[in-house]
Every structure is written in C-alpha cells, then in structure tokens.
C-alpha cells in the first residue's frame, strides 16, 4: 500500500512539473516593446529620443567630437533655447 501511495505521489509530482513547463513562455517569444521616448535619466543616443522639449541627450565626457562616450549618454534637463532648437531638429517628417 505504501508503494502505491509513493508511486502516485511521484506521478503527481512529474505531472506538476510538466504542466508548469508548458505554461512558461519562451524567452525568444518575449519581444521588448520600444517606447516612443525616453524618460530623464535613461540611456540615449540622440536628443530626439528624450521625452519632452526640455530634455536633451547629455554626454558628460563628450570626447573626440561626439564619436566616443566612455561613460555613455543619458536624458537630462535642458534650457528653453535648447527646446526651440530641438523642435526644429526633431520635426516629424
């Protein structure tokens, strides 16, 4: 009798793992969705990627004319002059 209970317990345990494995989605199936714009503090490559008019893509160590950024760039606060410049630069075509 004990053997039958043990056997059924093992069958139930195997069934639980099989069902859980079927319910998990593949990591390849999960596609990251791109945001329309980046919030302040997030990593960026261009001013047009940053949300709002008063945010710019700021690179603290902008060496070699913008071709190499050892620390990286992030969206940061800008002034009103930059806001006007960004409107012209980032017009939607």
UniProtKB/Swiss-Prot annotation:
Q: Propeptide-annotated positions?
A: 22-34
Which domain of life does this protein belong to?
Eukaryota
Tissues in which the protein is found: Expressed by the venom gland.
- What are the disulfide bonds? 37-51, 44-57, 50-75, 59-73, 83-90
Output the Gene Ontology terms for molecular function: toxin activity
Q: Which GO terms describe its cellular component?
A: extracellular region
Compartment(s) of residence: Secreted
On whether Disulfide bond is a keyword of this UniProt record, the answer is: yes
Q: Which residues form the signal peptide?
A: 1-21
Listed A to Z, the keywords are: Disulfide bond, Knottin, Neurotoxin, Secreted, Signal, Toxin
Q: Which family does it belong to?
A: Belongs to the neurotoxin 09 (Tx3-6) family.
Quote the entry's note on domains.
The presence of a 'disulfide through disulfide knot' structurally defines this protein as a knottin.
User: What functional role does this protein have?
Assistant: Probable neurotoxin.
According to UniProt, the name of this protein is: U11-ctenitoxin-Pn1a
Please report the organism this UniProt entry assigns to the protein. Answer: Phoneutria nigriventer (Brazilian armed spider)
């Amino acid at each position: 009798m004990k053997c039958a209970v043990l056997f059924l317990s093992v069958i139930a345990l195997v069934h639980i793992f099989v069902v859980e494995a079927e319910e998990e989605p593949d990591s390849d199936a999960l596609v990251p969705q791109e945001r329309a714009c980046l919030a302040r503090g997030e990593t960026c490559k261009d001013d047009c990627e940053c949300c709002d008019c008063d945010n710019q893509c700021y690179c603290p160590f902008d060496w070699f004319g913008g071709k190499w950024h050892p620390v990286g760039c992030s969206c940061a606060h800008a002034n009103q002059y930059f806001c006007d410049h960004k409107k012209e630069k980032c017009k939607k075509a």
